[in-house]
Curated annotation (Swiss-Prot):
Cytoplasmic membrane side: 1-31, 298-314, 382-406, 491-624
Protein's UniProt name: Polycystin-2-like protein 2
Alphabetic keyword roster: Coiled coil, Glycoprotein, Ion channel, Ion transport, Membrane, Transmembrane, Transmembrane helix, Transport
Principal location: membrane
Subunit structure of this chain's protein: Interacts with TRPC1 and TRPC5.
Source organism: Homo sapiens (Human)
Tissue expr: Expressed only in testis. Expressed also in brain and kidney.
Amino acid sequence: MAEASRWHRGGASKHKLHYRKEVEITTTLQELLLYFIFLINLCILTFGMVNPHMYYLNKVMSSLFLDTSVPGEERTNFKSIRSITDFWKFMEGPLLEGLYWDSWYNNQQLYNLKNSSRIYYENILLGVPRVRQLKVRNNTCKVYSSFQSLMSECYGKYTSANEDLSNFGLQINTEWRYSTSNTNSPWHWGFLGVYRNGGYIFTLSKSKSETKNKFIDLRLNSWITRGTRVIFIDFSLYNANVNLFCIIRLVAEFPATGGILTSWQFYSVKLLRYVSYYDYFIASCEITFCIFLFVFTTQEVKKIKEFKSAYFKSIWNWLELLLLLLCFVAVSFNTYYNVQIFLLLGQLLKSTEKYSDFYFLACWHIYYNNIIAITIFFAWIKIFKFISFNKTMSQLSSTLSRCVKDIVGFAIMFFIIFFAYAQLGFLVFGSQVDDFSTFQNSIFAQFRIVLGDFNFAGIQQANPILGPIYFITFIFFVFFVLLNMFLAIINDTYSEVKADYSIGRRLDFELGKMIKQSYKNVLEKFRLKKAQKDEDKKTKGSGDLAEQARREGFDENEIQNAEQMKKWKERLEKKYYSMEIQDDYQPVTQEEFRELFLYAVELEKELHYINLKLNQVVRKVSAL
């Protein structure tokens, strides 16, 4: 009676364990399905914001304003500007020709211009372009006493403290008088510094001839001086065919060393967001995204209340919190961006005779694009949380999680050597090789060396002795030693994980079986596959397996051997538990596992001894 009671309690606990497994697997499946719907919605939302026409519009505009030069003078396009003379040639030539389109290719007057230029006949110039200059004061640096007789003036690099705020030159109009900023546009991060808004501003005219005369007047009156550090050329376009705005900024920086460094920004953005039916579909996806965000936030709050400090011990929970934070930032950016469009767009489009500052809206559009791109990246990374139902993927994810400590230790050693070589390259080659001109460039150059994309001739020419030594030792220690050490860590951990997985079944793999079973049930429900019960009935109805085998042509010896093997299998299954037919299993302790391992070793020794004896017997029999 006591044994029956004990058996009943064991069966009940076993049934509860099985039920708990099923509940856990079902919950995981529900979370997986819900998350896939969220991920699909997020992908539609993000890819719906990107239009292939954005790239083509940027390409067309960059070709017009960066690559076009005056016929016969190659150094008059914007990319090749190296001096003040080249800059004025560009302003009076390619820039004017690119901004003012008032006739067709056959010199006929464009119709319905309404006092606006149409670049490439399709892109309306919004308002008028603006040219803005920032300067530094004299005596912002010191001249060494031995050279003061040769040079009394000194203009340092640009900083907000060194900026010149005084009027100069003719001291009339805004191009000669300093104007403070009245916009919320972010400061510009250039090659040589961070430039704030404001400065000496010149607004172009609607007339091409007036603008050209003004450029000539500025050049003759030396608008660009030794204190000039940067000039911005800003203007905006709108293409109604693809509903895109193109905000363009051309930047010419004047370093203290002399010469000119050019850079540019082309932002094709969709400021009129809800126009077509597809746009409203994207809006519905945005609303759905907010609903998902509310649901996921509620779930995580409940988990934190339930598990408290234990919640923060899982790396997946930290990823969940990071993803929620990014989603909230994306929603706040999108809300602020849409509010600013609603408040500013109408005013900007009305001011046709003034410069329309769309740069502020373009920057916020880029910020939102960046944050939503980072969000969808981590959303895809979270997929690894749900792939444990597949044995191979579970082994890979377990390998990465188990070798984290080893990789961190390896990374410390790797980056010590890596940064040491980066400093060596910067100090030895920095003044002569562009790839090592800054410490950041040195780091990226070394990554390129690892990938095999590097100009060895440059460092060899800069330093014929240290150049080859630097290159060979870097390749040896980083490429041959450290990277192979990294692969060894991964391989060793993967072997350990694979051995652990071969010992016993994991609960995670039950999820895969449940998915397969659900798939089979769906096929059977729609009659795309015969039910397993029907197949069993059909097999039983045809008679005994032996009779069926005789009908199929098997001889009696094969049938008897098969029946004997079946009896042996049934006897073994009664005596020993089989992992294939067990519904549940009790966890094995470390002590039990050690005893089982030692027992397996002893069995292996006995098998080896028996094998030797058997070989001896075979040799004796063969010798007779």
